[in-house]
């Protein structure tokens, strides 16, 4: 069923080659997650062995998904991606449900989360421009609490709680990035693709730098032995496993399985968005060949880099860090926000992966490898990575809403193209809602929204 449309039969121009399509796959996958989420995951599962198992499972799921989508993309080489596949395979209702969940949470939420992540690392260079306490512009008291009464618990469990609503400089900058990249992509797919290629190559170099520094320059064999000795032992002894046992009345092994599954939220988020390139199938040259090939090449390359990156983390930092020290440093930083960098300086090894400052494991590794410039270089590299990731998502996902609008399932104006052959109205709508989500919560909250809706 290789019904390849004639170039331009839907108004799009086929200007994306194999290299750019592969860079779109890799660029959409590699954002901020790989440099952050291993910290939270290690707090869940404890041992480095389990941490690697979760990343390998994520890799297996991603590559298998990429192979499936490669077949679908070859069969339906038109704009629309997952929406088109669901509509053709089942019914327009399934396409409608997916498309609107993508707009309200999955895709726009991902754009918002990665734009906010950019400012987390901007805060390494200039704290007042980041997302920390020193960058807060507005803090309004509010009491929001969502309880959940479990039959076996005498008291309800609080599953969401917030005491303040804050607006930071970082959120304003994140909104500005979304506006800037939306404008660039309104100028034509060639402009957006050029930005994507440049920033994807740069981010892959940054990821490679972490791997080289961790597995070569800064490898600490004492830390490696420590991580190997504790690879599996602490698996059912983490705080979160204990809490899960208390809340669910499960045994330790079942509780750990539940926590480990929840921990994969982070790795799945880091490997998410690989399928987004299928949204641009109407603009890819020779889509019957280039779409499947770009998906296979992109997913395999990124997953290999992700596993190597985690090995680099564990070659430099102990998986389990000093929780008491981390708590002490956090309290001191809250009292003296202007001295945050000085307070944390020199403690990367003691904090390890699990207690890394603001979960920034990649920065911690570079700080150990080269105190002084390493931390700054890594922050710059991750900012490049997140900037390119935001551009890639903005470029591709607007095509989803265009396809929905053409079928009468989205706002009609989103189904139009401007004089440069791009869905400008769809891009603008996407930008507006993404900015609303930027101001709706923290990075971790946005991440939870996205993965919950995706699953």
Predicted regions: what they are:
Residues 1-39, 43-48, 62-67, 78-79:
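Membrane-interface "cap" regions at the ends of multi-pass membrane proteins
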């Amino acid at each position: 069923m290789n019904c390849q449309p004639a170039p331009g039969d839907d108004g799009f121009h086929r200007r994306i080659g194999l290299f750019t399509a592969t860079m779109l796959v890799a660029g959409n996958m590699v954002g901020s997650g790989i440099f952050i989420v291993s910290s939270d995951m290690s707090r869940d599962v404890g041992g480095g062995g389990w941490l690697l198992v979760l990343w390998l499972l994520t890799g297996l799921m991603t590559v298998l998904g990429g192979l499936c989508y490669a077949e679908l993309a070859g069969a339906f080489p038109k704009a629309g991606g997952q929406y088109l596949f669901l509509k053709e395979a089942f019914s327009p209702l399934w396409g409608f449900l997916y498309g609107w969940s993508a707009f309200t949470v999955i895709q726009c939420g991902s754009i918002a989360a990665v734009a906010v992540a950019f400012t987390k690392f901007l805060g390494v260079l200039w704290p007042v421009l980041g997302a920390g306490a020193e960058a807060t512009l507005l803090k309004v008291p509010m009491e929001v609490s969502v309880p959940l009464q479990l039959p076996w618990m005498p008291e309800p469990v609080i599953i969401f709680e917030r005491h303040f609503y804050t607006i930071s400089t970082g959120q304003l900058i994140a909104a500005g990035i979304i506006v800037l990249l939306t404008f660039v992509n309104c100028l034509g797919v060639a402009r957006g693709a050029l930005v994507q290629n440049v920033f994807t190559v740069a981010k892959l170099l940054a990821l490679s730098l972490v791997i080289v520094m961790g597995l070569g320059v800064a490898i600490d064999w004492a830390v490696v032995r420590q991580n190997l000795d504790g690879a599996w032992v602490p698996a059912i002894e983490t705080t979160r496993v204990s809490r899960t046992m208390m809340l669910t009345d499960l045994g330790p092994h079942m509780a750990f399985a539940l926590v480990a599954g929840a921990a994969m939220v982070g790795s799945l988020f880091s490997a998410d968005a690989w399928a987004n390139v299928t949204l641009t199938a109407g603009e890819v040259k020779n889509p019957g060949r280039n779409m499947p090939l770009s998906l296979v090449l992109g997913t395999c390359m990124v997953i290999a880099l992700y596993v190597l990156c985690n090995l680099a983390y564990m070659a430099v930092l102990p998986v389990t860090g000093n929780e008491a020290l981390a708590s002490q440093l956090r309290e001191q930083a809250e009292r003296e926000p202007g001295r945050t960098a000085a307070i944390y300086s020199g403690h990367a090894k003691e904090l390890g992966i699990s207690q890394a400052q603001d979960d920034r494991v990649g920065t911690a590794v570079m700080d150990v490898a080269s105190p002084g410039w390493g931390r700054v270089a890594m922050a710059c590299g991750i900012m490049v990575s997140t900037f390119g990731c935001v551009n890639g998502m903005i470029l591709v996902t607007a095509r989803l809403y265009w396809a929905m609008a053409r079928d009468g399932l989205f706002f009609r104006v989103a189904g139009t193209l401007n004089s440069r052959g791009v869905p400008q109205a769809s891009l603008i709508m996407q930008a507006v809602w993404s900015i609303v989500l930027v101001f709706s919560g923290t990075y971790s909250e946005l991440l939870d929204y996205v993965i919950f809706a995706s699953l």
